[in-house]
């Protein structure tokens, strides 16, 4: 993907085509890829305020905030609808991005929506066809996404390109987002997006676990109907008894060379024992448990817990923690253990907090209530998560 002039320069000018972020495993807002190291998402004022006043101690546990951009709908030469961003002044050079380009990923999304390879994509047709999308059925069950299989699809310029495997959840969110924009706003309306660090850019096969943290998920400004809906979800899931539930995951299976994906509907149904088994599955590559990942993950979670305990007045309602590691098989050496683990290089893992649209703290512009002390629900969830991972570690 590069910054390029459209042939319809008078109407469009320079812009950065945004592609669905193919490693989005949870959430309901569409996350889009701006370049190899940057993603963007619809701007929510409370989340922007959080990033702009972020405590220093939390910066290593959150994506780097890179500012905001304006985004608009745009049709390509074939009439297909996409999103394009005004480029940042410091990023006017061509971008280096992954092979899963917008021409492939967005084409796949819109073909699922319209069911036609040659017809344009009218706004009304796009909105109607969302209800008929097979993607929703696919997302209700387990799915394996091959990174070897490479069916040919047609790119924007008519050439044949390979489509690599991807998580369907990001396409589902992108499709829903396009439909909302189409139905609620004129095509030429400008939308503001947050620019954030792509926290998985350094991983070859990013394994990602999205954990919704805390015993409460609704914000202070939620309507009574929304409060009741979120309270019911918490009561019927591990959010109530553990303070944490699975919101999505993808884990690379080395034996099948594919990602095993789970979505939020799977996570809501899990019992405490099911949650424990899902954590084990997240650390299993299809042939063995990646036991060497447990200690670095636990150290990182323990460090996060220490930071959260020190943040008075913060309530991270509906926020998530991402646990990330590389599913690329580690290189073995002559000094490797019997399990085939490299004896030298440490396992590359990360833990990041994301999604702060409903986070409140003293000084936030629309605070309804000022809380005292750290977030008890978030701490409860982290403590239980650490305890379960310790049990898995000791069991191995």
From Swiss-Prot:
Subcellular location: Cytoplasm
A Pfam family reported for this protein in Swiss-Prot or TrEMBL: IPK
A GO MF label: inositol hexakisphosphate 6-kinase activity
Distribution of this protein across tissues and organs: Highly expressed in cerebellum, brain cortex, kidney, thymus and lung. Detected at lower levels in hippocampus, testis, heart and olfactory bulb.
Catalytic activity: 1D-myo-inositol hexakisphosphate + ATP = 5-diphospho-1D-myo-inositol 1,2,3,4,6-pentakisphosphate + ADP; 1-diphospho-1D-myo-inositol 2,3,4,5,6-pentakisphosphate + ATP + H(+) = 1,5-bis(diphospho)-1D-myo-inositol 2,3,4,6-tetrakisphosphate + ADP
Enzyme class name: transferase
Lineage top rank: taxon: Eukaryota
Keyword annotations of the record: ATP-binding, Cytoplasm, Kinase, Nucleotide-binding, Transferase
Keyword DNA-binding tagged: no
Residues where substrate binds: 206-214
A biological-process GO annotation: phosphatidylinositol metabolic process
GO cellular component terms, semicolon-separated: cytoplasm; nucleus
Enzyme Commission number(s) of this protein: 2.7.4.21
Principal subcellular localization: cytoplasm
Gene3D superfamilies: Inositol polyphosphate kinase
Biological role stated in the UniProt entry: Converts inositol hexakisphosphate (InsP6) to diphosphoinositol pentakisphosphate (InsP7/PP-InsP5). Converts 1,3,4,5,6-pentakisphosphate (InsP5) to PP-InsP4.
Protein family per UniProt: Belongs to the inositol phosphokinase (IPK) family.
Name of this chain's protein: Inositol hexakisphosphate kinase 3
Naturally occurring in which organism (per UniProt): Mus musculus (Mouse)
């Amino acid at each position: 993907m590069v910054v390029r002039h459209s042939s319809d320069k008078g109407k469009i000018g320079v812009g950065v085509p945004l592609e669905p972020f193919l490693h989005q495993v949870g959430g309901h807002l569409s996350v889009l890829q701006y370049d190899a190291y940057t993603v963007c998402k619809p701007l929510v004022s409370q989340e922007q305020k959080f990033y702009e006043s972020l405590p220093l101690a939390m910066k290593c546990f959150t994506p780097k905030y890179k500012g905001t951009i304006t985004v608009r709908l745009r049709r390509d030469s074939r009439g297909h609808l996409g999103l394009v961003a005004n480029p940042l002044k410091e990023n006017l050079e061509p971008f280096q991005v992954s092979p899963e380009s917008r021409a492939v990923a967005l084409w796949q999304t819109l073909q699922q929506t319209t069911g036609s390879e040659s017809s344009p994509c009218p706004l009304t047709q796009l909105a109607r066809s969302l209800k008929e999308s097979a993607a929703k059925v696919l997302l209700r069950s387990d799915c394996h996404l091959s990174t070897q299989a490479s069916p040919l699809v047609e790119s924007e310029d008519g050439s044949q390109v390979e489509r690599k495997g991807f998580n369907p959840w990001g396409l589902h969110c992108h499709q829903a987002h396009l439909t909302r924009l189409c139905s609620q706003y004129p095509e030429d309306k400008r939308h503001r997006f947050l620019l954030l660090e792509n926290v998985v850019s350094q991983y070859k096969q990013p394994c990602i676990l999205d954990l919704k943290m805390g015993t409460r998920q609704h914000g202070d400004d939620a309507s009574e109907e929304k409060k009741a809906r979120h309270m019911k979800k918490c009561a019927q899931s591990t959010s109530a008894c553990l303070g944490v539930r699975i919101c999505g995951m993808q884990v690379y299976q080395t034996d099948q060379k594919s990602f095993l994906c789970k979505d939020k509907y799977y996570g809501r149904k899990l019992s405490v024992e099911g949650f424990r088994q899902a954590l084990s599955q997240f650390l299993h590559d299809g042939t063995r448990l990646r036991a060497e990942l447990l200690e670095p993950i636990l150290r990182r979670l323990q460090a996060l817990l220490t930071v959260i305990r020190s943040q008075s007045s913060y309530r991270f309602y509906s926020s998530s923690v991402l646990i990330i590691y590389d599913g690329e098989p580690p290189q073995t050496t002559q000094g490797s253990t019997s399990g085939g683990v490299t004896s030298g290089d440490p396992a590359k893992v990360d833990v990041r907090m994301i999604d702060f649209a409903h986070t409140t703290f003293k000084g936030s512009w629309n605070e309804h209530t000022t809380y005292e002390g750290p977030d008890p629900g978030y701490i409860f969830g982290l403590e239980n998560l650490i305890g379960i991972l310790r049990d898995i570690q000791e069991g191995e």
